[in-house]
Amino acid sequence: MNYSTALPDFIEMQRVSFCWFIAQGLNDELTMFSRIHDFSYNTEYRLFGQEYSLVKPVYTIVRAKKLAANYSVQLVIPLEVRNKKLNSVRYFGQFTIINLPLMTTTATFVINGCERVIVSQIIRSPGIYFEKNKNHRKRKQFKSQVLGHASKLGSFLPSGVPWIIPYDQPWKPWIIGKKLGYSKYNSNKDTKLDFYFYSLKSFKIYQKISKITNSPIKVQRIKLFLQWLKLNQKEFNFKNKLNLSELSFLLNYWNFIFKFIIKYQFLYKKNFEESYQIQESEFKTIFKTWNNQPQLNDSFSLKKIDQLTSNYEKKIQFYHNVIQQQFFDNLMLVPFITKEKKILNLESLANRQKQKKISLTLLTNESIKFAFYFSPSLKEVFKYRSPKKRKPKEAKIKQPILYLRSPSKIVQFKDDHQVLDSYKKKYDTKDFYTATLIPESGSWIRFGFQKNTKINRYQYPIRHQEDEVIIQIDKITQKPILYLLKEMGLTDWEICSNLKHADFFYFTKPFLTGSLTSKQPLPRFDLHSDYYKNISEFSHIFDARYYRLGKIGRFQINNRLNLKLNNRIYTITYEDIFAILDCLVTLSISKTTGDDIDHLKNRRVRSVGELLQNLFRVGFQRLVRKLGSQINKRESGQISSFNIIGATVREFFGSSQLSQYMDQTNPLSSLTHRRRISGLGPGGLDRDRISFAVRDIHPSHYGRICPIETPEGPNVGLIASLTTCARVNKLGFIETPFWRVINGKVIKTGNPIYLTADIEDFYKIAPADISTNSKNYLTQNLIPVRYKQDFITVSPFQVDFISISPIQVVSVATSLIPFFEHDDANRALMGSNMQRQSVPLMLSQKPIVGTGLENQIAIDSGMTINAQGAGIVHSVTADYIIVKEYSGRKLKYILQKYQRSNQETCINHRPIVWKGEKIKSGQILTDGPGITNNELALGQNVLVAYMPWQGYNFEDAILINERLVYEDVFTSIHIERYDIEIEQDDDVSEQITKNIPNLSFSEIQNLNDDGIVALGTFVKPGDILVGKIIAKNDSEQLPEAKLLRAIFGAKAKGVRDTSFRMPKGKYGRVVDRVTFNRKTKLAYKFEKIQVFIAQIRKIKVGDKIAGRHGNKGIISRILPRQDMPFLPDGTPVDIILNPLGVPSRMNVGQLYECLLGIAGHKLNRRFKILPFDEMYGPEVSRILINKKLRQASIENDEAWLFNPYSPGKMVLIDGRTGKEFENPITVGNAYMLKLIHLVDDKMHARATGPYSLITQQPLGGKAQHGGQRFGEMEVWALEGFGAAFTLKELLTIKSDDMQGRNETLNAIVKGQLIPKSGVPESFKVLLQELRSIGLDMSTYKIENYNLNQHYELEVDLIETYDSLEKTFPPTSNLDDISF
């Protein structure tokens, strides 16, 4: 078994992160903002961040909770304020910058007396991401037939120098069609070479070949092709023995040989005459070599070009004759002269092709062969020649044909044809991708392809360029990337030489120099020169103040782009941009999938420490802005500006999405809350606009993020939980442990190896439920493994790693579910979520069937008191434990007694050690809520039967035995806090007192002299908690009372009773009172009083209970125990569940659990069951349960426990009749939880109560004592039945007809008929709102004279009434208007 019992500390992530912040993160931020200037730069604030100190907290944790204060430390830094003009120090001293909330040992923060948790956030990691563009419209091909065929010429024709045809050849110039012009070429002396003829001839031959579409087309094409290549020589008869592959090989290398001969002139040496060699000295006049690149010399004159050109043309004529003689007589093997003078055959040619093409061939004896006429360099030279057009002699041109939309010819130069051809082959069918660069700070930068129909400054192979690469820093601002690089000072030559796919951006290889006269400066990019700052906003991307990749961003970019830059370079560099462009083009050609943004290698966790560090950065940035904008403020005022940092921190802890009120329902919920990972929050995802892909489970989540535990509803998949063994590394990536497997043996010595998601993809990893023998060798022949996010089977020798535990995959809450591999995932999700909602019971039990994690969850939950050091217990009481450590010091541990948790459950510690007991460090000293004897115990083991009972368990309802009520099986304690504010201002002055007029003695007997209820009092609804009175004003008194006071001169004014009473439906016992005093020297006055009331809640109809497998239900009836079905030994069943709740929900784990539970109950034994036990054999769970049931049956001599024909089913007897039920029934001990959805908190009734001020409709909700809304769908139901009068009542007197409802109340009290209803208030509000937008609506009353005549009378519905009291004047003429 590959199970590791020592799981890591469950809240280590939070604690380690906060400690890192205090030790290093805070220091980094203080160092970054060590010098701050005011607006005039005269005053400098200097923070000595390295010397900061933390002052001990004012309040302890317990006291901070009691007094609703913060548990925080003062951050003190030496501050120096210096006047730079006078060079004098105005202020120097220890300055308290902020009160920093301090983390408790249980990884929580106490803010305003409440425990809060900072949830870790999972966000996209800084780095570079490539994704495929969706819905990108592919450009339409230009459908001219000529153009289409011409573009394919390159694959068939030799793309060498175009043929120069001597005039005396037997075939005369070609004539194609009537409309096409024709040309004959005879002149060798013209500098402008006309290759029109070549184009036509090539096209004609190609068309002939392409028409052959029948069966042996390949052979025929090649045959025709070779025939044409022979020109007019005797037909080339190849032997039939050559197969197709040899022929195609021959054809492919034909082009290559041809180019080779002409371009590099590997011919016999004797054929070269001295006149055709150019001395190196002459070469130097044209070119100078710089950095291994040919570069034009500025002094090179145009006359030399003419001379060279004429030389060239003589040479071409000479070469043509040589080719005729040498090449066609010896086709297969052409003798080449190399330095070694060896014969080069076709195979070595294949290797030759892979070498880079060079534009100049330097040979020995200091002479250079003329090989650069068509190199890019000379082509550039020709551009600068004056255009001198001379018609060729003896050439006739009729109607020149435009093959392309632009007037360029199909083939201009040898390189053009070659590059265009390779460009199309390489890039024509490319896909479009976008690269997104996410820095640590700064906006995202996008690189992508964009259509641009303008001809660009730099030369492109296609004139109408549609695939320009642009850089974009926001939705509007964008620019072609090459423009940006040129603006930043790079030359074309540098850009080209740094790009792997330079041919995508540059048609020909650019020169280093831009012109013949002026020298181009080399790029010297200096960020601090003002010129570059003013170029454009894009220059900011190289500036660390605006764009900062950070440590993680640099690490990710280096990994993704295979760069070897130093990890401390936190800015974007040219190398990054070149690598991004290369990667974009490579992806476009290869059409591979883009990056998976949901992969955990591309997402990282920001924990408490990093969130606080970012918070300090934001605070200091606000401070810098504030000091920079303040003018002529006093020094003290400017120093007080530092409060803005404290305000930032308070704002984060108080109202951030990631700072949450801690879930303290039970120990499990509080532990899970601290291990939660949220995708929401600042910088995270937006819940409303998120896709399903982001919420989905990803293969890389394995062992890192739990696939089961996530909330139901809108946050599903966005909020997750760490798995049991996962941890977060220094860079924020989640790691999970594995054992190494070498040659089929699991190596378990030392610690397991932690792997991140990106490394894991390269190894074959086996799951934990693979059986091993005693020597740790894998025993199966075929083992299922994960490899590169796929699932394959391999032999044991190919396995690299194996998971350490079967529960490594799931979170802490899910790992508590036994047999969860038999449950459907949705039900397991509900099970793990509902365990977090279970209320700690007064008498809880450990589960009979557990999973073995209960002890560690109890230790790490923070709800118990753990020993800080080893020693011997000195004394134990209910309130404290004193431990004498071996070092001699005595430690006093104070226990919490009946404290209120955030969810109003009860936190109470009970000691479980005895005087004189030896204890170890970290051992649990007390039980806490939901913890019994060192183990988590959230519920009770109760006897359940799966059977229907009179319809009382229809649709998940639950029937329970009254034993659960009387024996306090599901009884819990809840503590509520009531805050009573004492108002003290100029108008109103409240006093608290016991002397309240007009009250009986029984009503005030439980108040003390201050008027506060005494401890231990049992209070019911309406009882006074705090007695308060307020003096009446004169205006409030009746006239006769004023008269009497004036006559008899009464000294005391009347007082009004404003005492705080228990709300309706609430009861309990007063367990604590806390008073808060005003900070006044004059008198001892209370400001606020808190009263804590504990109530014992037994289980009742309407409460929600659930199992651990997502089987939840509401209690529908509590049956007397004598009516419950009972077992043959007389034990009545505690709970009856509906058997139909199992098959459709597919949570069969509950049956396994309850059957093993009854076996354990009878055997007096508890079981720890790990999931995924199929490694020991098929159906092991079922076999184990049958064995244990049989064993229990034998040991207890109770044969009815195990029936081999229907194992797990027992005979039940009906408690009402005493007869057996017809069929055996599944009975067992299930572990059931009482959930916090209690009926006491939800039950609510209202007769009359408060109304909304404007619409005058009743308020909603229990807290406002509101009514029950009769909503839209309920109205449809009444409309469907035509219940008109019921509807009318609901719309008027039961809702917002103010006058009508008062009159109705009077009528009901007096027993009179209910009067007609009036106009609803909301209708009047609608009228007023329509008037506010300029629509004047009037209401009219229709009066009938007789059947045919009537007249209309306008009625003003908006009566004048006292707006404060909203009461009508007594005279109203609306009696007869009805709605």
Curated annotation (Swiss-Prot):
Gene3D superfamilies: 2.40.50.100, 2.40.50.150, 3.90.1100.10, DNA-directed RNA polymerase, beta subunit, external 1 domain, DNA-directed RNA polymerase, subunit 2, domain 6, RNA polymerase alpha subunit dimerisation domain, RNA polymerase Rpb2, domain 2. GO terms for molecular function: DNA binding; DNA-directed RNA polymerase activity; ribonucleoside binding. GO terms for biological process: DNA-templated transcription. GO terms for cellular component: chloroplast; DNA-directed RNA polymerase complex; mitochondrion. It comes from the Eukaryota. It holds the Pfam family RNA_pol_Rpb2_2. NCBIfam families: PRK00405.1 (NF001616). This is DNA-directed RNA polymerase subunit beta. It comes from Trieres chinensis (Marine centric diatom). The gene is rpoB.
